[in-house]
């Protein structure tokens, strides 16, 4: 990771601005997928409240309900959520039961295969796929593909001719970390870093992108 900063002065500046900073990982791809659904088209504080209520009312030991339990709670009418979130969480639960949403499984296959598998889950799109692969499997070298604000930050820092694919070559094998550092820097300028730290919630992109 220090070698990435040695190759790229912009990443070196991001490292210096956030010493010791690392991507905030979820316990599992299943939990990351649940968060992706809960935060879809929803402000982060509201999504965080939905997650807390889901854990408090239906989880055990401070954890989200197990996939089979989550599916049963939804289909029995014990758990109601806005919009299509219940439908999407059922699909996430089914995928977890089928073994798709496990860290070892997603890390064992090529990235393209993992993306294809995740995109078969109803309610999981490209943005959520990035989230699950980076924060759910804690992969260090997955480059986000649906982060428009990352693209804007790259343009801001590297110039109008720079692209995500070209500048990220110098970030290997820590493209995930570098991308999250740049996004965190942007969030800091926009004032959300302080809010997330104060609330104890993970720093995640605004889902209204």
Residue positions per predicted region:
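HhH-family (HhH-GPD) DNA N-glycosylase catalytic core used in base-excision repair
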Residues: 1-209
């Amino acid at each position: 990771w220090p070698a990435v900063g040695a190759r790229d002065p912009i990443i070196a500046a991001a490292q210096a601005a956030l010493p010791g900073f690392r991507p905030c990982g979820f316990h599992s791809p299943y939990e990351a997928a649940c968060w992706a659904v809960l935060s879809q088209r929803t402000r982060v504080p509201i999504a965080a409240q939905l997650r807390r209520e889901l854990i408090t009312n239906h989880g055990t030991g401070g954890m989200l309900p197990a996939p089979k339990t989550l599916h049963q709670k939804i289909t029995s009418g014990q758990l109601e959520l806005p919009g299509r979130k219940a439908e999407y969480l059922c699909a996430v639960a089914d995928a977890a039961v089928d073994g798709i949403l496990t860290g070892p499984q997603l890390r064992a296959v090529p990235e393209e295969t993992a993306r294809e598998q995740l995109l078969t889950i109803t309610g999981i799109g490209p943005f959520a796929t990035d989230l699950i692969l980076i924060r759910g499997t804690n992969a260090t070298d997955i480059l986000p593909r649906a982060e428009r604000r990352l693209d804007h930050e790259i343009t801001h820092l590297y110039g109008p001719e720079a692209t995500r694919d070209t500048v990220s070559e110098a970030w290997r094998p820590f493209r995930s970390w570098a991308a999250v550092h740049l996004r965190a820097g942007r969030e800091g300028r926009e004032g959300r870093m302080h809010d997330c730290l104060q609330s104890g919630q993970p720093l995640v992109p605004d889902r209204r992108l």
